[in-house]
Amino acid sequence: MRRWSWVVDALLIAGCAAVAALLKQDANWDQLQYHYWYPWQLFHGGFTDPDLYGGRFQNPLPQVPFYLLTSLHPVAAQAALGALAGVAAVVTRRIAVRVLDGGLATSTAAALLAVVGAGFRSELGTSYSDVLLAAMLLGGLLLVLREQPLLAGLLAGAAVGLKYTSAPFALALLLALLVVRWRGLLWWVIGAAVGWVVTGGAWAWQLWRTYDSPVFPFWNTVFGSPWFPASNLTDERYGVAGLQGWLHWPWDMARGTARVLDLPVRDPRWLILLAALVLIAAGARRMTRSGWAVLVFTMSGLVLWLAVFGVIRYAIPGEMAAAVVIVMALRLWCSDRVTTALTLALAVVTGVLTTSAASRRVEFGTSWYVVEPGAFARVQSGDAVLVDGQYPSTFLLPGNLPTDVTVHVVQKDFTPTPMRDWLLRDLAGARQVWVVTGRPPSQVDPTIGTIDYDNCSRIR
């Protein structure tokens, strides 16, 4: 049975890789603006501050796998991205094995129900790193179930160090640990601290040294950086508001009206999760400690996520664990065979009804990026380049500018801050200032004045 278990895991990874390779090449907005640019800067001498752009303040390490994979042929690179996402499916199946009194088929069906979710499908074969962080957090849950709190904390802390959006499910891991083995709390905390230092400590120090805050520009009411107003910088476009919003959210997700992304997203599995909770409540006496731990992780993580962020990409750990909860609820009342059949039916039906965020894709080429030769030939040493934050274009720059040219990305959210004066002081010493933008008006305009768009040239 163990041999077949490894075979199924390999097939899950291979299946995700194959699906990713069959899609067109990922060209999502965030990738073109900062998923490639900031890792490139990381490997080529560091950052040119100030950047008046939110992506600058995120740890670039989660994007390094994508950056390195772009050296491959685009089809191979995207297949590799799909394979990395498949790790989350494998870990989900392993969690199901721990909590379900069933065979290989039931746990595999749980993994299939997990991968048809809107969040996972939105990130499959893309440059987004949230699915990789989900694999780490789900791995932490698996380690909690195996009563290995030190390693579980290590993965949780590392995920938070890479991206603070992992925090809700890292805290959910802690609650799950209290269900399984509360005496392991100290070891979990030690592991989490070490994990955060390893992946996020250097980045926090870099932000502190440059912007006087280890989490700049977030939580500035606490850290008081002089470069940003004293606010906590929350995005109110997403999530829920008021009791009615909380109660309606599963139904809104099923209808596709929930505010979880800029693109339409629909996932009926959230309504099914509510039904699963009813089944679990009715059969609570037959629940195992491991089952309660998975339930606590899923529900507490989802509540924290929805209260703080509400962006579906950040909920992938809970989205995938929810599949295990649904199968767990069925298994309380049905045989192993019936549970497997019902789970597969749910995976097919919900997979058809689910709408994932269809980000921009283009036809595959011979390399991941192809920039028109000579597009930046007029830029010379000592110049400065400003990139409009509302038009994704930093991917055009790597390797196409003189090494001593400074590049600054400008976003309107940061132009009313003291960072604008810092930028203007730096630009005063530039031989010439160039702007990379789309059609006017540009977000650079409020910083340096209106641009003479009539004399601009097109870059491909």
Where would I find each of the regions flagged by the language model?
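Signature aromatic-anchored transmembrane alpha helix within multi-pass, membrane-resident enzymes
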Residues: 150-154, 174, 189-197, 324-361
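Membrane-lumen/periplasm interface segments of specific transmembrane helices
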Residues: 188-255
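Short acidic/glycine- and proline-prone juxtamembrane loop motifs at membrane-interface regions
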Residues: 119-132
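Membrane-embedded, lumen/periplasm-facing catalytic core of multi-pass transferases
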Residues: 35, 346-407
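Hydrophobic/aromatic-rich transmembrane helices and adjacent perimembrane loops
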Residues: 35-40, 130-136, 159-164, 168, ...
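Transmembrane-helix signature of polytopic, membrane-embedded enzymes
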Residues: 90-118, 135, 151, 289-292
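Hydrophobic, aromatic-rich transmembrane alpha-helices
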Residues: 2, 85-97, 251-289
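Short hydrophobic/aromatic helix or loop-helix immediately within or flanking a transmembrane segment
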Residues: 37-38, 42, 53-75, 247-253
